[in-house]
């Protein structure tokens, strides 16, 4: 039983962290309608800044309480991500569509390059020996707080301004809304939440590397939001769940598949076809992509469209 709990602890913690980062991106992508391909930069900034603060400042200054170290580290990580998002947003948010996506992608590549070349934070080998200050309970608590906070934000004047600016800038201006400021606020808040996820990741897994700022991480977060449903915070959490748990489940496919294909060969299936099928089923990336494509083909609105309340709302 202990082995099972230990096996589930890592993916559960990773799921919570990914859900937090995805909810931050949902505010930007689904709420403000801004396509960003470099969002992982803020995840990495939050993690690196928090770890550097704890190792190089807080501990040498005599701060030893784990709770205070974690709280201060999370605040530093979030603050760094917020500051970076503000600096990035002023030039980038003047762009639209593909140009904005390309600009944010460049920011992500810059962050990854800087992390690779800074020896003080481990360089290409990654930042190691980070104190483990949090685990699943802390991550779960932060995920609940973030979900409640963002849900409440959508009900405020700022949240409504963000949605109105996304839907129609002219109408937003008629209501006295400044679309640029609304988008800026959404971008900074969403990036700050993602910075929190990065800080939690660094202190939960005691490690962070430049790949945290890489394009693959940005695509994973984007995939979680799109697959789950861009218009819903719940969708982001469901997408993060699929993103983390599906690869774990697909690891158990090749064994039974090999037995079934052996039976099929005995019944007359050509051996070459069986070998190709087995090779495909042993490729977890291929299986994951296939499942995602089939899901989006069946449910373009994402996983959240399967939720009973969402289905009743759509049919009303």
Cite the ranges covered by each PLM segment.
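Transmembrane alpha-helices and adjacent helix-loop boundaries
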Residues: 1-316
């Amino acid at each position: 039983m202990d082995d099972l709990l230990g096996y589930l602890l890592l993916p559960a913690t990773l799921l919570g962290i990914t859900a937090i980062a995805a909810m931050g991106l949902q505010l930007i992508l689904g709420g403000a309608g801004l396509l960003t391909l470099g969002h992982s930069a803020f995840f990495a900034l939050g993690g690196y800044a928090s770890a550097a603060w704890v190792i190089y400042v807080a501990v040498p200054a005599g701060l030893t309480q784990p709770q205070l170290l974690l709280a201060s580290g999370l605040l530093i990580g979030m603050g760094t991500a917020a500051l970076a998002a503000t600096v990035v947003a002023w030039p980038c948010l003047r762009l639209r569509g593909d140009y904005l996506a390309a600009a944010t992608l460049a920011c992500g590549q810059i962050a990854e390059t800087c992390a690779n070349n800074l020896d003080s934070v481990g360089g290409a080998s990654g930042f190691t020996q980070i104190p483990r200050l949090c685990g699943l309970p802390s991550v779960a608590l932060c995920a609940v707080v973030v979900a409640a906070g963002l849900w409440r934000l959508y009900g405020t004047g700022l949240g409504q301004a963000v949605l109105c600016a996304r839907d129609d800038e002219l109408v937003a201006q008629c209501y006295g809304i400044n679309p640029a400021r609304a988008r800026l606020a959404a971008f900074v808040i969403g990036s700050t939440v993602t910075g929190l996820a990065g800080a939690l990741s660094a202190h939960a897994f005691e490690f962070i590397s430049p790949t945290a700022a890489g394009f693959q991480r940005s695509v994973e977060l984007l995939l979680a939001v799109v697959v789950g449903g861009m218009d819903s915070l719940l969708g982001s959490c469901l997408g993060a769940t699929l993103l983390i748990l599906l690869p774990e489940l697909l690891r158990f496919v090749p064994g039974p598949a090999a037995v079934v294909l052996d039976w099929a060969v005995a019944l007359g299936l050509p051996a070459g076809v069986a070998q190709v099928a087995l090779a495909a089923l042993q490729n977890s990336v291929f299986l994951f992509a296939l499942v995602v494509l089939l899901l989006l083909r069946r449910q373009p609105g994402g996983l959240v469209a399967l939720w009973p309340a969402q289905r009743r709302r759509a049919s009303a």
